[in-house]
Amino acid sequence: MSKLLVINGSVIPSDKSNSHEMARIFLEEYKKVNPNDEIIELDLNKLVVGTNVLTTETFSTYWGEEEGMKYINQLKDVDKLLVIAPMYNFHVSGMLKNYIDHVALANQTFSYKYATKGASIGLLDKLKVQILATQGAPKGWYPWGDHVAYLKGTWEFMGAKVAEPILLAGVKVEPLSTQSPKEIVSSITSDLIAAAKKF
């Protein structure tokens, strides 16, 4: 039995969210293939780890037991991570960035000790990650705003094995912008099911 952690990095209500619809299809198939796995869900909208911003005022407590360390230990305890990640202003949501700021901590999730010059060692090397991402613009419109590359690179930096991310792009441009989340996501259902079976 494996433990799967699901992180919701979307600010959109689930019934109106393309990324939530992607996650719904993915998890439905995942549960069929892995009926005994434990699934833990984190809604960053409702947690301090999603809303607490790193500033000079919060720096001394940011990685304390109730903040960063709690979630770092959770990542070390689970086997798999599903990240729900829409794009906002060319990046992940502020909540997801806050979460990553809490868990990307030297000597906990990565280390420079014993690394070769200019390199690091990721400490989450038993973690497998699947990224489900959406963005309003078609892929490639804004190459400098690649939130999927940021997420993939960050989790790999921390040692995780990242499965091929699934990006649903162009959701704010016609014809997709005129459709419901179910209609939009139906175009990649087979990709989601295939990824869930392998995860």
Curated annotation (Swiss-Prot):
Pfam families named in the record: Flavodoxin_2
Cofactor comment: Binds 1 FMN per subunit.
UniProt EC number: 1.6.5.-, 1.7.1.17
GO molecular function: electron transfer activity; FMN binding; oxidoreductase activity, acting on NAD(P)H as acceptor; oxidoreductase activity, acting on NAD(P)H, quinone or similar compound as acceptor
Protein keywords: Flavoprotein, FMN, NAD, Oxidoreductase
Catalytic activity: 2 a quinone + NADH + H(+) = 2 a 1,4-benzosemiquinone + NAD(+); N,N-dimethyl-1,4-phenylenediamine + anthranilate + 2 NAD(+) = 2-(4-dimethylaminophenyl)diazenylbenzoate + 2 NADH + 2 H(+)
Keyword Oxidoreductase applies: yes
Presence of keyword Oxidoreductase: yes
Positions annotated to bind FMN: 10, 17-19, 87-90
Cysteines paired by S-S bonds: none
Reported cofactor(s): FMN
Family membership noted in the UniProt record: Belongs to the azoreductase type 1 family.
Function per UniProt: Quinone reductase that provides resistance to thiol-specific stress caused by electrophilic quinones.
Subunit: Homodimer.
Protein name in UniProt: FMN-dependent NADH:quinone oxidoreductase 1
Organism field: Mesoplasma florum (strain ATCC 33453 / NBRC 100688 / NCTC 11704 / L1) (Acholeplasma florum)
Gene that specifies this protein: azoR1
